[in-house]
From Swiss-Prot:
It holds the Pfam family RrnaAD. This is Ribosomal RNA small subunit methyltransferase A. It is found in: Cytoplasm. SUPFAM superfamilies: S-adenosyl-L-methionine-dependent methyltransferases. Its main location: cytoplasm. The lineage of its organism: Bacteria, Pseudomonadati, Pseudomonadota, Gammaproteobacteria, Alteromonadales. It is an enzyme of class 2 (transferase). S-adenosyl-L-methionine binds at residues 18, 20, 45, 66, 91, 112. One of its GO terms (molecular function) is RNA binding. The gene is rsmA. Keywords: Cytoplasm, Methyltransferase, RNA-binding, rRNA processing, S-adenosyl-L-methionine, Transferase. PANTHER family: DIMETHYLADENOSINE TRANSFERASE, DIMETHYLADENOSINE TRANSFERASE-RELATED. GO terms for cellular component: cytosol. It catalyses: adenosine(1518)/adenosine(1519) in 16S rRNA + 4 S-adenosyl-L-methionine = N(6)-dimethyladenosine(1518)/N(6)-dimethyladenosine(1519) in 16S rRNA + 4 S-adenosyl-L-homocysteine + 4 H(+).
Length: 269
């Protein structure tokens, strides 16, 4: 049998499917997720139910978002899961997670995410951060390093700033390729993201912060003065106490928020 086939289902490259099969890793992830009935439990991309089954065992209801129609049909006829699942067949990148919120309950979101959509999906989920208690995701190890990076490091970038603006980021465990069918060509890792109830550095315009980060990191080797010349001048940098000759990866989340807030104030003046 091909190493791309698991439980009779062939992994589809266009969906970025790699199915988690190592029971020890599965148990550790489920332990980190800590399923309960006090939250709306949401899984993105349940696949062949490696995480779905053990999570559903300890709760009354699990909501899943799955794009692959064949996998949705398997879940709908699953002898144990079918009565516990609320299934949404569709693209998680376009899904309105706010519709899953129940009165008095925050969401716990988790999944073994397709690596080809993980970064845009992170940005999409940040839009619903106020409704989320925590998130646990299996991602490409490189993405976890970017999410948790410190200023001044190679991994630090736009994703880092936006993730750490919205959430506390904690790597949980590393997962080698042999834990999957088929084995991915990269190392994987699990990350825990906990949205802030009160942000350490509140931003007056998050869309502007996002635009500022995109513009700043567009050319990593250039200075802030060069990259942000359409937005901020030397007087602005001086007022903010930021050295305009620094590179974008040297600037903290707090400083990016300060720049965005300064721009908002300038426009309102």
């Amino acid at each position: 049998m091909s190493n791309k086939v698991h439980l009779g289902h062939t992994a589809r490259k266009r969906f970025g499917q790699n199915f988690l099969t190592d029971s020890n890793v599965i148990n550790r992830i489920v332990g980190a997720i800590s399923p309960d009935n006090d939250h709306v439990m949401v899984e993105i991309g349940p696949g062949l139910a490696a995480l779905t089954e053990p999570v559903a065992e300890s709760i009354d209801k699990l909501t899943v978002v799955e794009l692959d129609k064949d996998l949705v049909e398997r879940l709908q006829t699953h002898p144990f899961l079918k009565d516990k699942l609320e299934i949404h067949q569709g693209d998680a990148l376009k899904f309105d997670f706010k519709q899953l919120v129940e009165e008095g309950k925050q969401m716990k979101v988790f999944g073994n995410l397709p690596y080809n959509i993980s970064t845009p999906l992170m940005f999409h989920l940040f839009e619903f951060a106020e409704h989320i208690e925590n998130m646990h995701f299996m991602l490409q190890k490189e993405v976890v390093l970017r999410l948790s990076a410190a200023p001044g490091t190679k991994a630090y970038g736009r994703l880092t700033v936006m993730a750490q603006y919205f959430c506390q980021v904690m790597p949980v465990l590393e997962v080698p390729p042999g834990c999957f069918t088929p084995p991915p060509k990269v190392d994987s890792a699990v990350v825990r993201l906990v949205p802030y109830k009160e942000k350490p550095y509140p931003c007056k315009d998050v869309d502007l912060l996002r635009h500022l980060c995109t513009t700043a990191f567009n050319m990593r080797r250039k200075t802030l003065r060069n990259n942000l010349k359409q937005l901020l001048n030397d007087d602005d940098f001086s007022a903010l106490g930021i050295d305009a000759s620094m590179r974008p990866e040297q600037i903290t989340v707090q400083q990016y928020v300060a720049m965005a807030n300064h721009l908002v104030d300038k426009r309102q003046a």
